[in-house]
Amino acid sequence: MSNLLGIFDPMEEEKVVLVDIQDQQIGTMGKMEAHEKAELHRAFSVFVLNSKNELLLQQRAHEKYHSSGLWTNTCCSHQRVGETNREAGARRMMEEMGMTVPLEELFTFIYRATFDNGLTEHELDHVMVGYTDDDPVINPEEVADFKWMEMEALQKDLTENPDHYTVWFTIIFDRFYKHIQEKNKTA
């Protein structure tokens, strides 16, 4: 993943951090192999809200190896070895959405989802939130499109059209939304 100088080498296969259910690192594995073997690994999901309480969604690039063309939360990926959740979130927000947004960690959960192509996501997912009124400058290799969506309308659309969204987003959204509603009550 990195050369002797510690610089990331994009030609080297991306590795994921394998973890136990307490999020303790137990090793690393190539990303594709981890998804083929359904190994539990560390991941993160970023949700960005604007001042109108709309969520920034991305449509995954059509070339993605799973869940291509589906709508999902603002950004999601995997931490690198030694990288904090916020560092990983900031890195991928810049790579995918072309923006910098301060992130706050909200909660973690474990999920497992098998896809039609035989790959399985088995992740301990760290969910983070950020706030901005800026539109992203999307990287077309990662993201096909974006939109801001009002939370209640999104909740309704997730119920009516779940096949338009990634599996993990349908799993996370209600918990995220409840967390934000509680946070807004105490603010």
What are these regions (language model features)?
Residues 21-24, 53, 69, 118:
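Detector for glycine-centered tight turns/loop "hinges" at secondary-structure junctions
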Residues 56-57, 72-106:
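The catalytic Nudix box helix
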Residues 43-75:
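A glycine-rich, hydrophobic loop/mini-helix early in the fold
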Residues 35, 41, 78, 122, ...:
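Histidine-centered active-site/metal-ligand motif
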Residues 30-32, 69, 110-112, 119-187:
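Nudix hydrolase/Nudix homology domain
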Residues 4-45, 49-51:
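Acidic, metal-coordinating catalytic segment for phosphate/diphosphate chemistry
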